[in-house]
UniProtKB/Swiss-Prot annotation:
HAMAP family: MurG. It catalyses: di-trans,octa-cis-undecaprenyl diphospho-N-acetyl-alpha-D-muramoyl-L-alanyl-D-glutamyl-meso-2,6-diaminopimeloyl-D-alanyl-D-alanine + UDP-N-acetyl-alpha-D-glucosamine = di-trans,octa-cis-undecaprenyl diphospho-[N-acetyl-alpha-D-glucosaminyl-(1->4)]-N-acetyl-alpha-D-muramoyl-L-alanyl-D-glutamyl-meso-2,6-diaminopimeloyl-D-alanyl-D-alanine + UDP + H(+). Belongs to the glycosyltransferase 28 family. MurG subfamily. This is UDP-N-acetylglucosamine--N-acetylmuramyl-(pentapeptide) pyrophosphoryl-undecaprenol N-acetylglucosamine transferase. GO terms for molecular function: UDP-N-acetyl-D-glucosamine:N-acetylmuramoyl-L-alanyl-D-glutamyl-meso-2,6-diaminopimelyl-D-alanyl-D-alanine-diphosphoundecaprenol 4-beta-N-acetylglucosaminlytransferase activity; undecaprenyldiphospho-muramoylpentapeptide beta-N-acetylglucosaminyltransferase activity. GO terms for cellular component: plasma membrane. Its EC number is 2.4.1.227.
Length: 356
């Protein structure tokens, strides 16, 4: 098929990874994928690695900036819009698909001005600034979590595109007769509070329910985190980064982590119960809203960072680790919330809009 698609996503993995999953599906269907990003985001590494053509525009965020930056903002946005319009004219896409990040504002407006169908996808339970602005004139509005956007004939609840291997379910070994397995995902954003909390909390557990521990500490935090575990006499495997997340999820019985949009979707895909500690200063407190999606249904417990110390975490861990059937029930509920066809669904929406 001799047709181009322009994907817009930038900044963080939370925007870029779902977009990459959809890019691969577009390619599998014969489309040529172009990508609109910014010079500073993770897309500069990942998009060329995926063999996709990357176009860059110069735009940054405005929240929390000083007065001078705000005064310059209209000129920056106008320049970014002109750059985006040039890319749209050059690529001539059958549709433009935005997954969030600063790039999507100018890019989405450029699509509108060029008369190209615009589809947006929101990964979080609270829509980001750019997607909120674009929703009014987008042809379709895709959301990962129900009711992120107001009810509309344009709205589609698709779920988040996540790695396919998470859905290749490997039956977990029964908990009977073995230690439970705890996966801690400190990640790279806001990792240190979890890296401090978990060793202290686990040290408070009775020896007979101490779990096996695999702790992702985040880059440059592994040595200090491993030392914390040694100092309190808790055995743990600590790694700065887990390369094979599907394998780690398959190993685990319980996960302690933040509540980023992709993490929530991956927990559901893997069918894993979780204790969620939302990042307290996330924009619009979107991590708390993401966490509520699993917690409302009984697949997770939400533990606010401000009120969760070692004693509170130890008490919750003790409660769930002593009740294997509760863990099993939470796991089944998590799996029931997964959307394994999210990637196909998003691409189907785009193709429907592009070709009428």
């Amino acid at each position: 098929m001799d047709a181009n698609v322009l994907i817009m996503a930038g900044g963080t993995g939370g925007h870029v990874f779902p977009a990459l999953a959809c890019a691969r599906e577009f390619q599998a269907r014969g489309y040529k994928v172009h990508w609109l990003g910014t010079p500073r985001g993770i897309e500069n590494e990942l998009v060329p690695q995926a063999g996709l053509t990357l176009h860059l525009i110069n735009v940054t965020g405005l929240r929390g900036k000083g007065r001078l930056s705000l005064l310059k903002a209209p000129f920056m946005l106008l320049k970014a819009l002109m750059q985006a319009r040039k890319v749209v004219r050059q690529v001539k896409p059958v549709c433009v698909v935005g997954f969030g990040g600063y790039v999507t504002g100018p890019g989405g407006l450029a699509a509108k001005l060029a008369g190209v169908p615009l589809i947006i996808h929101e990964q979080n339970a609270v829509a980001g600034t750019a997607n909120r602005s674009l929703a009014s004139f987008a042809s379709r509005v895709c959301e990962a979590f129900p009711n992120t956007f107001a009810a509309s004939s344009k709205r589609r609840t698709t779920g988040n595109p996540v790695r396919v291997e998470l859905f290749l379910e490997t039956p977990r070994q029964a908990l009977t007769g073995r230690k439970a397995r705890l996966l801690v995902l400190g990640g790279s954003l806001g990792a240190e509070p979890l890296n401090k909390l978990l060793p202290e909390a686990l040290a408070r557990l009775p020896q007979d329910i101490q779990p096996e521990v695999f702790h992702q500490s985040g880059k440059n935090h592994d040595a200090v985190t491993a030392e914390r575990y040694r100092n309190v006499g808790v055995e743990a495997q600590v790694a700065p980064f887990i390369q094979n997340m599907a394998q780690a999820y398959s190993w685990a019985d319980l996960v302690v982590c933040r509540a980023g949009a992709l993490t929530i979707s991956e927990l559901a895909a893997a069918g894993l119960p979780s204790l969620l500690i939302p990042l307290p200063h996330a924009i619009d407190d979107h991590q708390s809203r993401n966490a509520d999606y699993l917690a409302r249904e009984g697949a997770a417990f939400v533990m606010p960072q401000a009120t969760t110390g070692a004693a509170e975490m130890a008490a919750r861990l003790k409660e769930v680790l002593m009740q294997p059937e509760q863990l099993n029930s939470m796991a089944r509920t998590a799996r029931s919330l997964a959307k394994p066809d999210a990637t196909n669904t998003v691409v189907n929406v785009c193709v429907e809009v592009a070709h009428g």
